[in-house]
A protein has these predicted regions:
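Catalytic centers of hydrolytic enzymes
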Residues: 1-219
Length: 219
């Protein structure tokens, strides 16, 4: 029956998630609460963004970003199933790629930080990029110290006039969560579902989570 097929798909092991340095093999949630992904870097967000960047690896994208509200439930260590992935990210989002100037990227990060005090879902989780956010500052002036990964693997400050190839999902690209500026960008639709990128990224090799260092919250 269809229900039985669905159950077997949901129970299908995909791969493993490991915490760097933890050899116990026990199953623990990557964060206490998915709501954390709306106010800080979170390990589940790191894995989701790394999978997005990995899914876009043949496009030349060097940065991935998407809204923290995408994380509906924490991922956990140990063996993860398709059902676990769908619980974490129960959305039909697809991967898109576009070219943004540094100025546009900064604008997106500022918009992401603009609803910080309300824990708004638009707060951006990232890969290939690091930034600081100071919630006490006025909206539009909260983001600083933005760095991007270079092709050589180092880091350099974001340059306003430089152009960066960015991977995100169609939801944000089409102006979801108030990202109206994204509607002006020419996005390339890959047709790849983010959930499939996540599945394949975890399936190819155990994912070792080393959280920290992407987003600094300044108090």
């Amino acid at each position: 029956s269809y229900a039985a097929q669905l159950r077997s798909l949901i129970g299908q092991p995909v791969g493993k998630i490991l915490l760097a340095g933890d050899t116990s093999g026990r199953q623990v949630d990557l964060e206490e609460d998915a709501h954390l992904c709306r106010v800080q870097e979170c390990p589940s967000g790191d894995v989701l963004m790394d999978s997005l960047l990995w899914g876009a690896r043949d496009t030349g994208a060097t940065v991935a970003l998407s809204v923290g509200g995408t994380v509906r439930s924490p991922l956990h260590t140990g063996v993860v199933t398709m059902g676990d992935l769908l619980t974490t990210m129960p959305f039909d989002n697809t991967l898109v790629v576009g070219d943004l100037t540094g100025k546009q990227l900064l604008g997106a990060l500022e918009h992401g930080a603009s609803g910080y005090e309300n824990g708004a879902g638009r707060f951006l989780q990232v890969a290939g990029l690091t930034y600081s956010v100071e919630p006490a500052k006025p909206v539009g002036q909260r983001v600083s110290a933005v760095s991007v990964r270079t092709k050589a693997g180092g880091w350099e400050p974001l340059r306003p006039e430089a152009v960066y190839r960015v991977a995100t999902v169609d939801y944000a690209a089409e102006g979801g969560d108030g990202f109206a500026a994204f509607k002006k960008i020419k996005w390339q639709y890959t047709g790849r579902a983010h959930i499939e990128c996540l599945r394949d990224y975890i399936a190819k090799a155990p994912v070792e989570v080393r959280s920290g260092g992407r987003i600094k919250v300044l108090r």
